[in-house]
């Protein structure tokens, strides 16, 4: 979700400091310590990495899990992080929440409070993988990479990450939306997201919720990311509005990820609990996805690394995370892949 503004008449909030792709513009008096987007391999000991194709297969999803994803448009219950990894990421999250972080200007977007409701707070930022070692290495999680390969059906690249923080008792909502409605500046639609809570997630503290089967509804218009939780209902038919009444709540322990399709309708309610609800989203694309930047407004006025029309997403800001030929070799034939007919293709929606 979230990205540069598309020519729809709506605008997206812009970061406080603007730069063209490949350029860093710093606020006065600040210096960049290190732009980690230049490093396309793990730089910490956050994960133990497989050393052979056999070790990679230990992370493989089952055929039943793939079928569940195809039917519902999401797949919960994939362990990404353990206790020590969670603590390291929470410590780094606390650091980058500070607007005075020396590398703050590297964020693609940085919103201390994107909530529209009075008295609510929703921290939201994109591009944290460039700032701190563990945040940088999270997309290289072996469990995440293997699942992404199976669900996307090919080599995997990082699209962008997101941070969401809902503070206790007054955390704001994220309204029902589809991610790809914000991403039509890339094509074809071969995208995937993994939502990873850093705290135990429940309905009470605003866990992510999904509408099963909504990835088959086609592309819906943008109706807003915050504010009215049910704003998207205006774009739905009666059957679809009825489905909003019975969402699936992804109540998962900290560190357990939920993967979802780019057309799956999802959102999260307020955090009314006494606990924080912190989460990281890793958004991915299959290798070969291209820029469709001509549909964007004001391409030069934000920090998001937009590539020229028709250019394949690659280079500094879109690192290759996993390639089956190099990691699996001949054993790739043993790994089941998701069927590619669970949702309409971009030219059908």
Residue ranges: model-predicted function:
Residues 1-8:
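N-terminal acidic, proline/glycine-rich, low-complexity intrinsically disordered segments
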Residues 3, 13, 17, 23-55, ...:
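Non-heme Fe(II)/2-oxoglutarate
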Residues 12-72, 78-176, 182-185, 223, ...:
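Non-heme Fe(II)-dependent double-stranded beta-helix
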Residues 49, 201-265, 289:
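Double-stranded beta-helix
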Residues 58, 74-76, 193-197, 247-249, ...:
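Conserved hydrophobic/aromatic beta-strand scaffold that supports enzyme active sites
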Residues 133, 146-147, 181-184, 196-199, ...:
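Short helix-to-loop capping/linker segments positioned immediately adjacent to catalytic or ligand/cofactor-binding
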Residues 178-179, 228-244, 274-276, 294-302:
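Short, surface-exposed loop/helix-turn segments at secondary-structure junctions
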Residues 184-203, 251-252, 283-286:
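Short, conserved beta-strand element in jelly-roll/cupin
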């Amino acid at each position: 979700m979230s990205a540069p503004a598309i020519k729809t008449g709506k605008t997206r909030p812009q970061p406080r400091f603007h730069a063209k792709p490949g350029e860093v513009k710093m606020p006065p008096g600040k210096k960049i310590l290190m732009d980690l987007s230049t490093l396309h391999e793990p730089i910490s000991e956050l994960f133990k990495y497989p050393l052979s194709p056999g070790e990679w297969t230990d992370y493989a999803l089952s055929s039943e899990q793939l079928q569940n994803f195809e039917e519902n448009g999401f797949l919960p219950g994939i362990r990404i992080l353990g206790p020590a990894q969670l603590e390291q990421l929470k410590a780094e999250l606390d650091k980058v929440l500070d607007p005075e972080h020396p590398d703050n200007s590297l964020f693609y977007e940085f919103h201390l409070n994107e909530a529209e409701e009075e008295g609510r707070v929703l921290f939201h930022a994109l591009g944290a993988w460039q700032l701190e070692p563990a945040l940088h290495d999270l997309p290289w999680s072996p469990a995440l990479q293997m699942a992404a390969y199976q669900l996307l059906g090919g080599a995997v690249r990082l699209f962008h990450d997101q941070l969401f923080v809902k503070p206790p008792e007054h955390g704001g909502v994220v309204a029902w939306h589809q991610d790809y409605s914000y991403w039509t500046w890339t094509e074809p639609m071969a995208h995937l997201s993994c939502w990873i809570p850093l705290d135990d997630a429940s309905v009470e503290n605003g866990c992510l919720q999904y509408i099963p089967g909504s990835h088959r509804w086609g592309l819906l218009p943008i109706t807003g990311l915050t504010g009215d939780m049910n704003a998207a209902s205006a774009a739905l038919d009666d059957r679809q509005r009825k489905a909003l009444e019975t969402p699936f709540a992804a109540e998962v322990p900290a560190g357990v990820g939920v993967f979802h399709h780019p057309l799956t309708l999802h959102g999260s309610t307020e955090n009314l609990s006494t606990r924080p609800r912190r989460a990281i989203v890793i958004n991915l694309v299959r290798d070969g996805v291209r820029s469709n930047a001509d549909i964007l407004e004001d391409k030069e006025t934000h920090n998001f690394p937009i590539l020229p029309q028709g250019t394949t997403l690659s280079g500094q800001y879109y690192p290759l995370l996993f390639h089956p030929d190099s990691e699996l070799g001949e054993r790739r034939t043993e790994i089941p892949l998701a069927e590619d007919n669970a949702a309409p293709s971009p030219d059908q929606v």
